[in-house]
Amino acid sequence: MVCRPAIFAWLSCLLLSLSPELLAQQQRNLDYYLNAGLANSPMLFDSTSQFKANQLDSLKVLAGFRPQVTSTGNITVPPDLGKFGYDSAITNGGNYSGVVTAEQQLFSNRPRKVQFQNITLLNQALRLNIQLSEIDLKKSITAQYITAYSDLSQVEFNRNLLKILQDEQPALKKLVENGVYLQTDYLNLNVSIQTQLIALKKAVIQYRDDLYALNLLCGINDRSEVILLKPEIPLRSAFFIQNSPQMQRFRIDSLRLRASRELIDLHYRPRLSAFADAGVNAINPRNIPHNIGTSFGLNFTAVIYDGRQRRLEYNRLMLREITRQKYRDFYSSQYQTRLYQLQDRLNATDELIAEIHEQIAAQQRLLDMYKVEIANGLVRFTDFILNVTSYTTSRNSLVQAENDRLQILNELYYLK
């Protein structure tokens, strides 16, 4: 009994569609997807736009300390209705004015310096947010790439295992015809081939699904079949928590709280400005040519009492500082714990992979011996199938362990 021709035709088409030679021009590596993800991310574009917009605020602050020139104009004509109308002592009979005023804040070096410092710190915070967003995006893309690559490894293994079973089919058929093996042994092989065909198809479906997920994450509109190259993720050996982006954020937050306190102090600092104006200010239109003039002077403002709002603002900043310290201390403890966890998992996974390789090597030698002995009719064919099943389990464990190792390396590399 043989497999139906339609099944083998379908198998041939499937294997051809997955042929590495056919897809040699469609190989892609991790860098391709990382670059595409960074270029297409609307979140990164938005963060970069916010950073550029905040840089413009420094120019706005600088302009605010330069002379401010304004112009005002007013024409007021109160009609005389006999016994009714506004009192002329109040309205002066009308108002006709047009004045240009220039005002300059004096002794503004300190306020300007503090505001520039605050904007600089905000720029640093935004730049750090961009860096953290890039790290998160790269980590997510790499994790999905590893998942898809693991699926591809599973496809390759299932194809190779299918070839092993198919290679035994002609020899076993001849041995069955010669009475060395039973017809049930041949049927058992065919069932194993059918099972492996289904496993291969499921692996292909899973690979394509995870490849689509990778394209979605990177903003790539592409339906073509590609071969993913093995990701090269270096083993990060140096970890300095003080240089981590998250710890830098805590430091910037501390400096911003200090700058906020200085801004509060500036609000209560006396302010002095000089002004000058020129124009026309008349109550009678006929006197406008004679009412052209100018004036100048000083403006002084100082807060005397505001209900102790300054102290309340100080208390609010103090609460924010305490909260910042709590988050920083928790992050520091969490960082070290996470680092130890990942390093322990990596060591354990490396040991597991080494053990699985030894097991697979032994199973491969046994499988080769079975092939020779089957050809001579020296072993039960069911024992060969059991060995193939055991070999399959070990290879699946190896694929999963290697996937876990790559994921751990990804976690370590982008630990923040």
Q: What residue spans do the PLM features occupy?
A:
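Bacterial N-terminal signal peptides that target proteins for export
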Residues: M1-L11
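Bacterial N-terminal signal peptides
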Residues: A9-S19
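Bacterial Sec-pathway N-terminal export signals of envelope proteins
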Residues: L22-Q68, V180-Q183, C218-S260, Q343, ...
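Acidic, low-complexity, intrinsically disordered peripheral segments
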Residues: L23, D31-Y32, S397-K416
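Amphipathic alpha-helical coiled-coil segments
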Residues: D46-V61, S133, L137-E156, K174, ...
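Residues that define the transmembrane beta-barrel architecture of outer-membrane proteins
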Residues: G94-Y96, L255, H290-T294
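Periplasmic alpha-helical coiled-coil/stalk elements that build and connect Gram-negative outer-membrane
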Residues: E134-Q248, R345, T349, Y391
